[in-house]
Every structure is written in structure tokens, then in C-alpha cells.
Amino acid sequence: MTGSLWVGTYPDGGPAGSGEGIWRVRVDASTGELSAARLVVETPAPSFLALHPRGHTLYAVAEVDKGTVTAFAVSPDGLAPLGTQATGGALPCHVLATADALYVANYGSGDFTTFGLAADGGFAGGPEVHGNSGSGPDPERQEGPHAHYIGIVGDEVWVSDLGTDELRRYRPRPGGASAAGIAARLPAGAGPRHFVAIGDVVVVATELVAGVYVLDHQTAAVVARHDVAAARGHLQPSHLALSPDGSHLFVAVRGVDVLSTFAVSAGAVRLEHLADTPVGRGPRHFAVLPPIAGTDAALVVVADQQASTLTALRVDRETGSGTPVGSVPLPAPACVLPAR
């Protein structure tokens, strides 16, 4: 059985808008082999993608100074633009789609932007922009707010801010969201990047002081902190995600360029580090696919941004170690998204 992936990219050796775009790659579900990478549409700096829950619309940010987000209608023939909107902020780096709303994190300006969505997945009205203020102790990376990632936690939308060491909460409403205060504060200088909700806890990967924090969803208290990898050296976590059955947590770590695997137990309060699997340079993002046919091994496809390669790993359930089973060259991949 063959599936496919959408892949967003960064500019490859040139300024934003110089030819980068959205690619599609085939993946063999029985082996993990990757093939037939092709550029589907050229669009500036599509560093992050999101798919509408119905699968009929794909959204791509343009991570440029005057940020935009574009909606594309998905068809067997490719992608057709439905419209482009300004995000009202700079350097949008993450986008999340629900049935009736689109959420964007603007890294450069620290803003969180919301859009209402029409039935066809296109935009329904202009942006609603929520600003933020503050800073952290790192003068180079925390001189101001830097919204980085958006996730659904319970019935709220949470936004991580790498610049202020905060997770902010918002309550969705038709066409937008209402600010609801600070969900959690991480240790000063930690730099929260991506997070995932698991039951009653939220697990956060911090980029500046590399670590994995487990937070109580209700009290925001830090329940546990784990090293992000066994390796030593420059550690810079990028993305984290669960296996389909919730039994394992994967964390991509740049610098040492590994995919770390943790076993999840006791409602994610306990994470046991199992293994670090070498990948290509600059693992910025990855997608966790259903297990390879006939096995219980996870299939993880990693976007090795600096190596300009997609790497598919077969990750053993018991040991957490990954074995490369496929790769394909692709210019500066930044985001991997399973197609439907």
C-alpha cells in the first residue's frame, strides 16, 4: 500500500520567494521506502503546513518578514490556491487548522493570529491578531516574544512563546479566540518550543536549555524534567510527537542530530529514555505514520533540513532504536505532513 506526504521547505540557498515550495513524496507503507518526490506548487518559504480535518484544504505559512498564509484546495492533480491572507505579524512559523478556524504563530513579532474558515476551507474574513510582550534572560533569542507553536489542550488553544518562557491559553469562539491568560511558565531561559498534550499532562520540548518538561494540565506545575538525549554537546530540540498508540514519545534534536525515543507510562508522568537514532543534519520536524505493515514498529519520517533529505526510520517498539528504511533528496525540508 502506498501513501503520500506533503513537505514544506525553506529557501534553498537564496532569499525567501526564490523558488521554494510544497512537495509531495510517496511512501510505501509496507517497507517505509520513499520515492517520487515532486514539486507540486511554488510558494514562498512554506516552512509549516496544516491540513484541514476534512482533508480538502492545505494551508502553508510564508515565513517572511510580512507574513502570509495561503489556503490550497487539494485534488488528485495537485494544489490550487484558494486565497492568501496577511497574518499581521512577522515570520509565521506554525499553523494549525480546525473545522472552522485557522491559527498561526508569528515567531518574529510574537503575535498569535486567528482566521475564520468557510465550508470550502477558504478564509472567512480577515485576521484577528493577539499580541504579546515580555522577554527572557537570553539576550540573543529572548529579546522579545516569539510565538512558536500552537496546540489544542482540552477545550483551549495553547501557544508556546520561546521568548517569554510561557505557554499562553486562548478560548476558541466563532471566527477567532479570546485570550485567557498564562497556562504555564517554564524556567527562565528554557525557551519552550513545541509541546503535546497527553491525558492530564502537557509535555514540552525546550530549545534554549535543552530538555523535556512534563507539566500538570490543571496546576501548570512541573511534574518532571528529562534530558532530551543521552548524547552530550550542543542540543537543540525542535519537534516532539507521540506514536499512534501513545506508548512512545519521539523528540528531534538538532546539534547532535538524533531522533530520541522515550517510553511513556503512568499517564506520561514517567518518560523512560530508550534510544537516540542518528539522522541527517538539522532534523527540524518529523511525521509519525502508522506502523509498517505486519509489524508493531513505528514509521517516522524526518525532515533533515540542513542535509536536504527526508529520512524514514523503522523504530523498534522495545528498544526504541531506529533503522533507516528510506530516504529521498529534497531541498531544505522543514515540515512533513501525512496526506489523506
Language-model features: locations:
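Short coil/turn segments that connect the beta-strands within blades of beta-propeller domains
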Residues: 2-3, 54-56, 99-100, 154-155, ...
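Conserved beta-strand positions in repeat-built beta-propeller and related beta-rich domains
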Residues: 7-11, 15-16, 60-64, 104-108, ...
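Beta-rich catalytic cores
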Residues: 18, 44-47, 91, 146, ...
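Short loop/turn segments immediately following beta-strands, especially the blade-tip
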Residues: 25-32, 71-78, 115-124, 171-177, ...
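Conserved beta-strand position repeated across blades of beta-propeller domains
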Residues: 41, 50, 96, 151, ...
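Asp-box/WD-like beta-propeller blade repeats and closely related beta-sheet repeat scaffolds
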Residues: 79-149
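Surface-exposed loop and turn segments in beta-propeller and other repeat-based domains
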Residues: 127-142, 224-232, 276-278, 329-340
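Loop/turn-rich, solvent-exposed surfaces of beta-rich toroidal or solenoidal domains
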Residues: 235-302
